[in-house]
Amino acid sequence: MWILALSLFQSFANVFSEEPHSSLYFVNASLQEVVFASTSGTLVPCPAAGIPPVTLRWYLATGEEIYDVPGIRHVHPNGTLQIFPFPPSSFSTLIHDNTYYCTAENPSGKIRSQDVHIKAVLREPYTVRVEDQKTMRGNVAVFKCIIPSSVEAYVTVVSWEKDTVSLVSGSRFLITSTGALYIKDVQNEDGLYNYRCITRHRYTGETRQSNSARLFVSDPANSAPSILDGFDHRKAMAGQRVELPCKALGHPEPDYRWLKDNMPLELSGRFQKTVTGLLIENSRPSDSGSYVCEVSNRYGTAKVIGRLYVKQPLKATISPRKVKSSVGSQVSLSCSVTGNEDQELSWYRNGEILNPGKNVRITGLNHANLIMDHMVKSDGGAYQCFVRKDKLSAQDYVQVVLEDGTPKIISAFSEKVVSPAEPVSLVCNVKGTPLPTVTWTLDDDPILKGSGHRISQMITSEGNVVSYLNISSSQVRDGGVYRCTANNSAGVVLYQARINVRGPASIRPMKNITAIAGRDTYIHCRVIGYPYYSIKWYKNANLLPFNHRQVAFENNGTLKLSDVQKEVDEGEYTCNVLVQPQLSTSQSVHVTVKVPPFIQPFEFPRFSIGQRVFIPCVVVSGDLPITITWQKDGRPIPASLGVTIDNIDFTSSLRISNLSLMHNGNYTCIARNEAAAVEHQSQLIVRVPPKFVVQPRDQDGIYGKAVILNCSAEGYPVPTIVWKFSKGAGVPQFQPIALNGRIQVLSNGSLLIKHVVEEDSGYYLCKVSNDVGADVSKSMYLTVKIPAMITSYPNTTLATQGQRKEMSCTAHGEKPIIVRWEKEDRIINPEMARYLVSTKEVGEEVISTLQILPTVREDSGFFSCHAINSYGEDRGIIQLTVQEPPDPPEIEIKDVKARTITLRWTMGFDGNSPITGYDIECKNKSDSWDSAQRTKDVSPQLNSATIIDIHPSSTYSIRMYAKNRIGKSEPSNEITITADEAAPDGPPQEVHLEPTSSQSIRVTWKAPKKHLQNGIIRGYQIGYREYSTGGNFQFNIISIDTTGDSEVYTLDNLNKFTQYGLVVQACNRAGTGPSSQEIITTTLEDVPSYPPENVQAIATSPESISISWSTLSKEALNGILQGFRVIYWANLIDGELGEIKNVTTTQPSLELDGLEKYTNYSIQVLAFTRAGDGVRSEQIFTRTKEDVPGPPAGVKAAAASASMVFVSWLPPLKLNGIIRKYTVFCSHPYPTVISEFEASPDSFSYRIPNLSRNRQYSVWVVAVTSAGRGNSSEIITVEPLAKAPARILTFSGTVTTPWMKDIVLPCKAVGDPSPAVKWMKDSNGTPSLVTIDGRRSIFSNGSFVIRTVKAEDSGYYSCVANNNWGSDEIILNLQVQVPPDQPRLTVSKTTSSSITLSWLPGDNGGSSIRGYILQYSEDNSEQWGSFPISPSERSYRLENLKCGTWYKFTLTAQNGVGPGRISEIIEAKTLGKEPQFSKEQELFASINTTRVRLNLIGWNDGGCPITSFTLEYRPFGTTVWTTAQRTSLSKSYILYDLQEATWYELQMRVCNSAGCAEKQANFATLNYDGSTIPPLIKSVVQSEEGLTTNEGLKILVTISCILVGVLLLFVLLLVVRRRRREQRLKRLRDAKSLAEMLMSKNTRTSDTLSKQQQTLRMHIDIPRAQLLIEERDTMETIDDRSTVLLTDADFGEAAKQKSLTVTHTVHYQSVSQATGPLVDVSDARPGTNPTTRRNAKAGPTARNRYASQWTLNRPHPTISAHTLTTDWRLPTPRATGSVDKESDSYSVSPSQDTDRARSSMVSTESASSTYEELARAYEHAKMEEQLRHAKFTITECFISDTSSEQLTAGTNEYTDSLTSSTPSESGICRFTASPPKPQDGGRVVNMAVPKAHRPGDLIHLPPYLRMDFLLNRGAPGTSRDLSLGQACLEPQKSRTLKRPTVLEPTPMEASSSTSSTREGQQSWQQGAVATLPQREGAELGQAAKMSSSQESLLDSRGHLKGNNPYAKSYTLV
């Protein structure tokens, strides 16, 4: 097999790489300028780089690659350009002040950097100076540092000095960005100092100090503004901060107004007016324009006008950013430019500029678009867009990646052998860009259409071309080498392989071949047929190969000729194929060798312009004919060039008769023949002799100025210009000019002299040469003109006040010269009497003298003499100082201490003579200066001194003198000062500690002794630390203010049960005194903070677990360990929790005994101290060990045929482990044979075959665990029968399932024949067949399936099986578990930081409650927190709540099914309210002249700790408040440093967590003599004419409007009240109807006796309640708030039977003993959500707090239960003459005499007057421990249908008409509580029960309905059983009874009832018995047993209470 693949590619320059990681980039693209000092040199790294490493080169801007100049310039291998330090004489513009650029090149391409201007700065001397300034006191002064223009660009101001002290920008001194010094609010003393600026050269680092300047300060005088600082133009880049100075001097202070482009400028945002002028932040180009600063006051105006130029930085961006294309495609690039306009844009490719050409187009505005067509591979690389404007430039680049679009073979056919007539398909898969064209050949012959070959192709989704060649029936001639060729503009690729067709071998005729000499040639032998033996080649009968250039491939018949030679290789070649050993065939081919041309190399010699050129191109070898052509620069030579070409045979000549510059270029000679085309290229360079473009001419130069001597020339090569100089005007003797920093040659050849001096005058010669032709030169004469200059003058001079002074200056320059004298800015005229000016000429100089007669202080300052001529002006500044004795210093107190006083003085005018010393005098205030203590000759360098050894609090007088060389000053101002206080010398007294809690200690103490206080005690520092005898702990310090002589402070957040040491220190203004003696105490004990660790539990037996744990550390105990408590409970299999138990021990281990076998237990351990239980540990789980199981719970056996029986059983009730198997025993007595059969643990039936017919067998079953066999079940007998009756092996029982699951009820029946099975469900006591639908079906095995089980699927199901011989039935009780109902959540107790919640669980949904989730949120907050709560809990206390804050709560119960409904949101508020100030307390304790003591005891914290105390005060009529903010409130607070005899405003703000309170007050300090000042008077000024008519009318209209408004408000209140009443009545009626609807629609049928019915609950909102119960000896007040639950069944029954009073009895589980208040409702809000609270009706205003009062007495143990009666105010039916006795029931009913009744019962508190209060009291009465076994009777009032105000109860003879105070809305009229039943007496021997009140002591309120369905329960005996069964099993029927079942009264009950009542009861009982269905006694007993759970059923029994249609009573048991 063979495969030959050849690739032919076009020839491209290898300048591009497709390496994926090849890239170029810039490391510092912003580098555009490098300035350096000539003395230091510089290193300039190339800004470009790349990966892989790049080649870096540097070029001049002209494109010339730079070269190393030893010692001057060097390019390092890493591309860094170094310029070496050099002296000024070696300065070269070409090197040291030129533009460079750098290139980086790698296979990715080539990029060039932006132009980098490199400039060397020569070191030249310069001076900076500052001029004296004038200003007015209180105004602004501006000093400027004047820098010479020659160095201004390099020198910056770094600081200013005042005398020798550096100034920093601050409140009064400001240094601007331009280096100016601003002095704000100038004072006289500012004129006493010298000011100078310090500059630094940016590049040389040299610093210069200016001369000293003075500030002359004058008194303010009215004057027009004069500009001190301004600007004429500013340049900035966008984004920079711009400062435009504008400052003027004037009085009054002038106003500033800014205009931009003649429009007022709005000063806001980015534009800000500052002290210095205008500040522009983040400048923009739009900010450019003309700015005017107008300065004006009432005396005149001034302006500063300037322009601002904000330039946008140039930025170029090329898009697209990534260019990836292919060869032959078009590429378009766009360059977007931001920044200045009119910029120049150019394109570069690989560092070379791009010009428009054949395939290159540059279009768009400013040439922004580059379009390149027909891209070739050399076009790839880096493309750059350069933008240039002035000296700014920017660039961007992008790499253009050209993919190799050369075709590539992806997959192709392979060599194969086929048989004749066999179809052949060849495939060639090719890719390339552009899409290649595929052609096919067979043995180098094209395959044509119709030749038996079919060619087709397709393009895949990947862009590949797939070409197919198909041969439907191959023949021998179809064999050969097939080649597929793919061709596109990028290249060609081919693939070939041989296809052999079996058949006789032969050779297809071969075509002659033409070979090219010097190249390789392949000759293929075109063999067809297969197989054959060999292929051989011959030439001239010689077997090939016979030399090294010949290679014969015998396997495929190919001959290769390398480096073909015409003489050797041309000729006949024969291919011989050996077909059989003795048979061969052959074919010959002729090879002709063609020789390509070879051009003899030629080069252009050096030619000059105008010469003639003749260049021959000779082809020295190659086959004829040969064609020769010429090209210039790659294109045909245009005829316009005048070039002549002569061709003769194998030669061609190029002739140019007259050379010019346009002939420059590359000339190429191209020779072609049949073999090839070759070329040779040479460059023609035409040289041009130099000539002048600008010739030098005579010029004048001004001394000190710059001059340019023009001279420029052109030529090729670029000519060199050399300058020479001949000094003077004589015969020129030219010498080369030494170039330096002052004299430079410009790039155009001109000569620059930066600073002309007199020696520069003379002849200058400009010589131009370029080695082409003769040099040219031209001379010129430079004349130097000298401007007027001051050559001599004194810089400074001194004069003595009152004496004569002369000053002179000398001028030099071109005559005539005028000299003028100035003083400051005033010209000195001859009219000035004290000044005399004289001038004289001495040679070339002019001397001028100024005389002053005599000198005064004002003569001090700067005088200047000005010299002026035609060429310039100069001036000399002379500083005259007039000396005199100094002014006295201004002294002030710098620091006062207890025993030292430090003075500070400011020296006034020093008399222009240095101060030589100071004298200080100090005396007691009462002494004379003669006895003063003096300190002389204090150093003049000092400006402060300290006086020592003074007495604290003593008063002294101090003054001082200044001295200089001239004399002594007058005495200074006299100051009087009192020494400071000293720190206390004694500790606080009587320090006592008292622990108040486990984390707090109360500290009390008294102030130090008076004589040791050393001032006013202002506060104390308390230091405390944990006390340790061996430790050295640092004290924690707390600072507090003083409140009086005795202090109290409580330390909080301390460690529990920890010993602390404490000290107290007193503080005054001077500091802190000594500490008190350290006192030790210990915080109180607390519960442990952490649980025991490492709790481990191991099961030791089936009934015991061993537990161990680690003891707690001392830090975690928080007290003395009393022991450990282990809490444990069983986790039952069904997910329920067992009883929670706990065991106490003192050891860290415990053995739990008596546990359930093989049961998983949850275990927690806690430690407890004397303070209580600590934190429980995390639950751990341990299972007891296995034991032998109990007996199976049941066994059944039934005959299935004559020889086979089935046995079924139930698992043991006590598994005691994992059941491994069951063993079934079968035996018969005759003979005794016991057979054992094993069944798997998950099997509960077994088939026993092969039994004898009609023989009885004994069967029993045993369960087996890993511990062994358990006890056997009961033994049953069974007999195989041929006619086996139907029997059911499944057991009856209860099936429990969660809702929404699929449930299968099994019913396995056996018998012979097989029995039929049917299912029925008990419906209202009557079984009926189950409904078969999509949710219910019966399997073939008899099982009944219910899918997605629901609550209504609960009930009793019967499975009946029967056949011909018998039947059987089982009953399955299906219980469906649902999520639990919502709990009933109430608030039971509140404190200032905690809220205790209690709840009653709702219906558990058939599954025990697993836990609760309590959620809470602070009011007005959307954030909710949550707590998981144990299922056994019924209350929860939330700690660490905010005081006086409302909170919202919800509770959710969870059972095995999931979470239930969320309870209603209830709200509660922690105790506390905002602070308030007591009116009985006086705010101001004491007031004197400068101090006020505030009495803060009057602030009541409202029960919540004060969190902040803010006090502000200010003098009356001012706007600035003085603030004192504290976090704690002390007893008193002292305001210090007040102004005497001043009225003050005072406002206080005190806050706690409940809110804030404010208090305002005014007070006045006393006069200095202790007298008071006049009070504040607000005067009202009224005109004498009195009120006008219009004013009187206005008052009348105002009063009328107020009266009308009050009237409207009163009417509105009446309407709102009536509407609220109507809405309230409507809501109650709606609640009634809703309850009836819920009763009828939402009743959940319950077939399970142990489960209470599920009902929809409604929330009841009861804001307040009050319950009154008297006790004979004591009275206890219990605050209460609760929620009432009534049921819709009750409400509905009441609606149906209004004429009856129905009593319901409910079992209620007792709660724990309560000894304190049940709940505090003083801050309760109505409603369970914020909207309800806001809309609730306000309660009675007469009382602020409600009390629930219980009167409890202890019953005698032998007292029997009393009869419960409804205790209406109606007369009780009795015999005539009977005496009323107080009822033994607890009753509350409406009272007519409300005021009298309440007063007699509640003392000063009002009794309840609303239904809500009684309903809440009733709810919590049920929860009281004392009433756990009491009976409650409720009488409920309903709305009268007749809307009557009178409620009637019974007949007329029993009617008691209620007054209008009786409520006309529904509610509980009363409820009563009676002692327990006799059988409960033993359990309540020591329990208190309530005593009933009189009928008049009643409280009334309406009911809020929340319905629970109530089930009836009968009385003992037949009627009771029937009632119970009816209520539990047939609830629907129980509601259809005409009358409820009533119990017969007990003897005690009968004694309290009337005869008519008993008759009514008997008649009702008869009716009830007649209608009740009969049930089996066992079932009723079971039902009674189930109903005793905590969620007990409610039963109804009636008591006939007369004919009152609006009352019914409820009795709860």
UniProtKB/Swiss-Prot annotation:
Cellular location(s): Cell membrane; Cell projection, Axon; Cell projection, Dendrite; Cell projection, Growth cone
Coiled coil: none
GO biological process entries: axon guidance; camera-type eye photoreceptor cell differentiation; central nervous system development; dendrite morphogenesis; dendrite self-avoidance; dendritic spine development; homophilic cell adhesion via plasma membrane adhesion molecules; locomotory behavior
Signal peptide: 1-17
InterPro entries: DSCAM/DSCAML_C, FN3_dom, FN3_sf, Ig-like_dom, Ig-like_dom_sf, Ig-like_fold, Ig_I-set, Ig_sub
Region (Required for netrin-mediated axon repulsion of neuronal growth cones): 1616-2013
Domain comment in the entry: Ig-like C2-type domains 7 to 9 are sufficient for interaction with NTN1 and commissural axon outgrowth. The transmembrane domain is necessary for interaction with DCC.
This protein's name: Cell adhesion molecule DSCAM
Record organism: Rattus norvegicus
